[in-house]
């Protein structure tokens, strides 16, 4: 039994069939009992302590520490050191550039604390600090660029120096841009308005102008001007509000302009609206230069945006009550386009502020003629013939003598020059007024060194054949009404006593008004007469009569029922001036 059990144990252990032998027999020289002890213990003791520990312990102490510890100790510190050196070099270059640009040493100190703070930041916030430093540099340089732009816009040097010396905390309003020169101050606009349009601004019992003042918070005053003037200056002022796109002064100006264009006076309901209107502003010469801009860039942009013609007229086109350094800004175009151009012009000029204490000075100076009053001619003199010697154009046959009233004696030429000087040939006339819309300014008398016009009342009489009555009066009085509206003069027509076949046309008003009315009457007569001579400005032969003035028909004459813009539009319709 024992032998059988030993044989079964051996077979279970080795998996081999062992011959049935006794326990004292040797198997390969070894007893079965000894062979069993070695074979049973050796396979498990050799494999377990050698193979298994090497399989799990070797990778842990050798490979894994090298894989994670080496990059942390070598690569990452080197990478951040290189970045810090490059950024430090970059800040050094920025500091050097700022030292070259800035005049004050304080600007350099602004960057040193920032650079020191940059290097103290942790690595994870490093990028954010870098962007912040770059933003500071851009803001610093941006202030300098803004100063240069404002200098180019025409800010006077003495105001520019005051502006730079102001503290930074007071330099901005509403977080936008620097305050304008003269701050705090008021914006003042002066618009020239025909006298007959003043009523549409005031309204019945002043209700219209009172409503505009209450709604816009602007101050509106209509200046009377010297006696005899056909225009009035409407001054609109108000406290400037830079944060507002439509400050009180601009709002008031635009509303006054709308009343002039769409006024509800009696004339507006009788005449159709014209296709072209004209608006004129009085501005100081310095503001006019700023409005033109460098190489005309500013005024060109306004013209393109509004589809209007915007021009700055010379000193010869100033009204008698204008200040010496004033200029006239004229806008011509369709009513809506002119309104848009006026808004753009006011937006550009609103930055020129005026102290409120100076506004009464404007009011007082503009209510009296200020332009060379010492050259005013005596009351008994005019550019026409001596009183009591009315010129005779007809008598003895029409055109028998040249019109003597167009060539007064030298002693009567004191202020208004003779027609040869007042009306040069068309090809030699300077480009003034609104020639694109059918007229030149009626006051072309300011030539050479002649003084400007003054509000002196004169009277002119003309003897005209009755055959020209229809041309002068027009259908249903259209021509004579057109002459009165355009010139502003008083024109009366009556038959000449004792001279059959003639009529007397009497024109009264200021020198410019009389000149314009006479010119218009001559143009109507020329259109009904013979062709013009080759030399329009010379004295005509006897057989040509009024023909010397035919060439001026294109300047003043127009269809009275639908005048083509310019002053004709101003005085013949409800659309302003």
Swiss-Prot record:
Disruption phenotype: Delayed flowering without a significant effect on the photoperiodic or vernalization responses. The late-flowering phenotype in flk-2 is rescued by the disruption of PEP (pep-2, pep-4). Gene3D superfamilies: 3.30.310.210, K Homology domain, type 1. GO terms for molecular function: RNA binding. It is found in: Nucleus; Cytoplasm. One of its GO terms (biological process) is positive regulation of flower development. Keywords: Cytoplasm, Nucleus, Repeat, RNA-binding, Transcription, Transcription regulation. Positively regulates flowering by repressing FLC expression and post-transcriptional modification. This is Flowering locus K homology domain. It comes from Arabidopsis thaliana. The lineage of its organism: Eukaryota, Viridiplantae, Streptophyta, Embryophyta, Tracheophyta.
